[in-house]
């Protein structure tokens, strides 16, 4: 039982506690000893509660008990203080009143109290029914009151505690908690307490071992041979780091805050001494340290819990089958036959994963295998990496027909992959706060590998049929796996990661004896892995010169197919939000056009133009149009219209506008987009300088995102503009409501264009917390194209509502006409490209400077 001196009249318990907490916070800022902080905070609250209990004259027959984390003797700066008011029997009205007054005074002291009032029998009953209550009482600690009553509670509690049942319940609870956080420690804003790899995963281990009598500290688990010395040291170090992060989060937020929110990541990183450099933000350096700790905790949690399970549930079931002299399968898990295998034969480390791939029915690695891998780090040195046998095994792992993704993920989880590929280790846990990627670099790479592999699996052929078809005809799929593994391996080093990664890939191919034909393709893919995406999304695919240049870069069908497959896998592996049907269409169009050119098709603009027109005429005849009805409209169209639209689009807008060539009123027509998502909208109207801005403003007010815009002015001064628009969650364009929205857009947009109103100020749309915390520095690049006829305007900035309208409004104000617009939204980042009429810009340098300045202002958050 603890005792404490009564407070003097001049100092209330609240004042004493407040002063002590402030002193401890200042001490922590100076020395950063988190274990001292949480222990002393708990002691300070102990003293305050004991003083209050005595001042209130609480009955000697009752006991005040600390439970939960507070019972463990730890309190974080703004954690709840969980207490149990233990009674010998159910309280009468008078005692209830006194207990309520006591709890009220606890709140008055500034404590966030979580209280329960129970008898011993009620405690046991609740603990039997609710594992959360059972866990809270597991760490109970007497503060003051009737010690005999508390000992009775302890005896009854221990007598009813079933370690095996407790283990099963906590395992289920942990799996449910992990599922809530998507089973990954690598979220953008992880919860340092609850996420996989967080403090809770460490507490689960100690709860289970305490309940089973195996120990309640890492040292006790070491003594009881549940941990090795290295594991105990690692667990203590990672626990200390996670506790420090949690304590600093509480202090920075001024309240209980366990989530590493974007708003606090930079400040938290600075508190740890990180500073930004050319390659990494402060927040990225902090999060890498967190992810490494969470990864280690996840790995050790799995190892230790499997060992606890083996102790609690000893099984008589023997080896299911012997695989070879080094490995056996037991209940679907791959075990090493000898705990010293890796120390004796380091080559068996990589063999583990090859056997895992090749052995049907094996679903994971057993606890003894995981532990042996964890403790074999010193074996995985430069000599081990240079061993020809290990190099052959690693290449064989990448060349297997199945199991590659799972094997590589296991290799990453056990840190074997980073120990074999040293440069891969450098990007493990590296987050990119670019508003684009939502995975760490290592997780992104493994996601891309997974996407490439799925193209080769028959069961997944329905997901991306065209990719699956190409992969089925690709002679060596493993080449793409190697390229995927290296495509972003040089991220965060500074410099061009494609060039640096290419050098890494070339070195790997040479060291692993990969044939020159395959090595050349791998190296080329790593160097050019962004090329196809950039051409498809930022250049004019209707320009034969663009296609000819890209075809020259690619050179062959094999290279084209490989690049296309890697590009699709890469974009889909950045974020669930980035891939859409429009990007799929652009990439597939570029693939098919380039394939025709590689097969000998002409890129002569005149031949392409005539071929496109003839295709459109055929479609118009099929639509029962008079063979000459289109001629009046087409006579007013320049070559660009026919080169930038495919035959189906030309036939579509021709059918709607052919008999309205000289209309005085705007005409708007819309249809379900041929790509399968969103709408395609065509506008035909007497031209005006602010037309593009008006249309942009309308779509943004409706919550529709413009993905692509093709802007043309006819020979007689009319605008013929087509737009590809999507619904990014506004709910406006939903299956079953297309007819209504098409009618609405056609009517409202035509009416808006016809009005002679001043362009409204662009809205300052709300931006996300992530965008506020990690804004993209706006960039404006304005330069003439090779022919000097147009100017290319490239922009990148943080996305927000109203941004495109703000850009269009600046262009309209300076009477600069837009010819094409490629709107590329990557998560919360935009990278837009506009082709502008160059006549006014060529004649006026001041206009160029004014345009760039005002655009930068419009892009600013």
UniProtKB/Swiss-Prot annotation:
UniProt record similarity statement: Belongs to the GlnD family.
Alphabetized UniProt keyword annotations: Hydrolase, Magnesium, Multifunctional enzyme, Nucleotidyltransferase, Repeat, Transferase
Protein species of origin: Ralstonia nicotianae (strain ATCC BAA-1114 / GMI1000)
Family matches, as InterPro entries: ACT-like_dom_sf, ACT_dom, HD/PDEase_dom, HD_domain, NT_sf, PII_UdlTrfase/GS_AdlTrfase, Polymerase_NTP_transf_dom, UTase/UR
PANTHER family per UniProt: BIFUNCTIONAL URIDYLYLTRANSFERASE/URIDYLYL-REMOVING ENZYME (PTHR47320), BIFUNCTIONAL URIDYLYLTRANSFERASE_URIDYLYL-REMOVING ENZYME (PTHR47320:SF1)
Required cofactor(s): Mg(2+)
Record gene name: glnD
Pfam families, alphabetized: GlnD_UR_UTase (PF08335), HD (PF01966), NTP_transf_2 (PF01909)
HD domain mapped to chain residues: 441-557
Function field: Modifies, by uridylylation and deuridylylation, the PII regulatory proteins (GlnB and homologs), in response to the nitrogen status of the cell that GlnD senses through the glutamine level. Under low glutamine levels, catalyzes the conversion of the PII proteins and UTP to PII-UMP and PPi, while under higher glutamine levels, GlnD hydrolyzes PII-UMP to PII and UMP (deuridylylation). Thus, controls uridylylation state and activity of the PII proteins, and plays an important role in the regulation of nitrogen assimilation and metabolism.
EC number: 2.7.7.59, 3.1.4.-
PROSITE patterns: ACT (PS51671), HD (PS51831)
Catalysed reactions, semicolon-separated: [protein-PII]-L-tyrosine + UTP = [protein-PII]-uridylyl-L-tyrosine + diphosphate; [protein-PII]-uridylyl-L-tyrosine + H2O = [protein-PII]-L-tyrosine + UMP + H(+)
One GO MF term attached to the UniProt entry: phosphoric diester hydrolase activity
Stated name of the protein: Bifunctional uridylyltransferase/uridylyl-removing enzyme
């Amino acid at each position: 039982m603890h005792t404490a001196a009564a407070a003097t009249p001049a100092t209330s318990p609240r004042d004493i506690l407040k002063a002590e907490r402030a002193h401890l916070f200042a001490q922590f800022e100076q020395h950063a000893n988190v274990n001292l902080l949480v222990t002393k905070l708990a002691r300070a609250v102990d003293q305050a509660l004991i003083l209050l209990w005595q001042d209130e004259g609480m009955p000697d027959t009752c006991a005040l008990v600390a439970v939960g984390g507070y019972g463990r003797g730890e309190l974080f700066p703004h954690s709840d203080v969980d207490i149990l008011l233990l009674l010998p029997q159910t309280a009468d009205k008078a005692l209830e009143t006194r207990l309520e007054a006591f709890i009220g005074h606890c709140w008055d002291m500034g404590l966030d109290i979580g209280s329960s009032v129970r008898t011993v029998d009620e405690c046991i009953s609740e603990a039997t029914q609710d594992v959360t209550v059972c866990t809270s009482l597991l760490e109970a600690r007497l503060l003051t009151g009737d010690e005999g009553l508390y000992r009775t509670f302890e005896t009854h509690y221990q007598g009813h505690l079933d370690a095996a049942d407790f283990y099963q319940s906590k395992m289920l609870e942990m799996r449910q908690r992990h599922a809530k956080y998507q089973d990954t420690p690598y979220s953008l804003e992880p919860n340092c307490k609850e996420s996989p790899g967080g403090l809770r995963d460490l507490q689960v281990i100690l709860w289970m071992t305490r309940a089973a009598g195996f120990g309640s500290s890492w040292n006790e688990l070491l003594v009881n041979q549940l941990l090795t010395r290295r594991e105990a040291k690692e667990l203590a170090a990672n626990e200390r780091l996670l506790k420090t992060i949690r304590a600093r989060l509480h202090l920075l937020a001024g309240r209980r805050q366990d989530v590493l929110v974007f708003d606090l990541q930079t400040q938290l990183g600075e508190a740890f001494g990180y500073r930004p450099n050319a390659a990494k933000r402060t927040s990225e350096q902090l999060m890498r340290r967190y992810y490494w700790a969470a990864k280690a905790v996840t790995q050790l949690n799995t190892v230790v819990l499997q060992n606890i399970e083996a102790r609690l549930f000893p099984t008589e079931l023997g080896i299911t089958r012997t695989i070879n002299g080094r490995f056996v399968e037991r209940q679907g898990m791959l075990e090493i036959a000898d705990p010293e295998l890796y120390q004796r034969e380091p080559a068996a480390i990589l063999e583990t994963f090859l056997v895992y791939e090749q052995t049907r029915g094996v679903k994971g690695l057993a606890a003894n295998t995981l532990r042996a891998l964890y403790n074999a780090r010193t074996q995985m040195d430069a000599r081990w990496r240079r061993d020809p046998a290990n190099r052959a095994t690693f290449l064989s792992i990448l060349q297997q027909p199945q199991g590659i993704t799972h094997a590589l993920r296991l290799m990453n989880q056990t840190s074997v992959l980073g120990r074999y590929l040293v440069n891969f280790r450098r990007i493990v846990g590296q987050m990119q706060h670019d508003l684009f990627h939502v995975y760490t670099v290592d997780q992104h790479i493994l996601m891309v590998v997974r996407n490439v592999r799925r193209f080769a699996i028959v069961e997944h052929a329905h997901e991306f049929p065209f990719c699956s078809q190409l992969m089925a005809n690709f002679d060596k799929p493993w080449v793409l796996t190697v390229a995927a593994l290296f495509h972003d391996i040089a991220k965060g080093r500074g410099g061009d990661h494609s060039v640096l990664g290419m050098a890494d890939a070339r070195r790997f191919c040479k060291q692993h004896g990969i044939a020159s034909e395959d090595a050349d393709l791998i190296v080329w893919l790593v160097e050019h892995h962004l090329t196809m995406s950039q051409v498809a999304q930022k250049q004019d695919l209707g320009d034969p010169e663009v296609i000819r240049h890209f075809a020259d870069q690619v050179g062959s069908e094999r290279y084209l197919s490989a690049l296309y497959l890697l590009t699709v896998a890469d974009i889909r592996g950045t974020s669930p939000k980035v891939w859409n049907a429009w990007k799929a269409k652009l990439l597939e169009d570029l693939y098919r056009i380039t394939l025709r050119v590689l097969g000998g098709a002409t890129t002569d603009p005149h031949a392409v133009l005539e071929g496109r027109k003839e295709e459109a005429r055929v479609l118009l005849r099929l639509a029962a149009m008079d063979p000459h009805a289109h001629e009046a409209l087409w006579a007013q169209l320049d070559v660009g219209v026919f080169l930038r639209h495919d035959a189906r689009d030309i036939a579509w807008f021709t059918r709607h506008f052919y008999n309205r060539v000289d209309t005085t009123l705007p005409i708007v027509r819309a249809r379900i987009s041929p790509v399968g998502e969103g709408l395609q909208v065509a506008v035909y109207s007497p031209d005006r300088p602010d037309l593009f801005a008006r249309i942009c403003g309308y779509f943004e007010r409706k919550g529709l995102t413009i993905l692509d815009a093709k802007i043309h002015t006819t020979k007689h001064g009319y605008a013929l503009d087509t737009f590809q628009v999507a619904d990014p969650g506004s709910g406006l364009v939903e299956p079953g409501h297309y007819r209504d929205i098409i009618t609405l857009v056609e009517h409202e947009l035509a009416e808006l264009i016809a009005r002679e109103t001043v362009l409204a100020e662009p809205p300052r749309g709300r931006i996300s917390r992530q965008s506020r915390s990690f804004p993209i520095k706006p960039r404006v690049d304005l330069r003439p194209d090779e022919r000097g006829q147009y100017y290319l305007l490239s922009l990148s900035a943080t996305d927000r509502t109203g941004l495109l309208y703000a850009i269009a409004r600046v262009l309209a104000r300076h009477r600069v006409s837009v010819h094409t617009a490629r709107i590329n939204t990557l998560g919360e980042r935009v990278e837009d490209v506009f082709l502008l009429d160059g006549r006014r810009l060529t004649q006026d340098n001041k206009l160029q400077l004014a345009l760039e300045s005002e655009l930068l202002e419009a892009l600013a958050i």
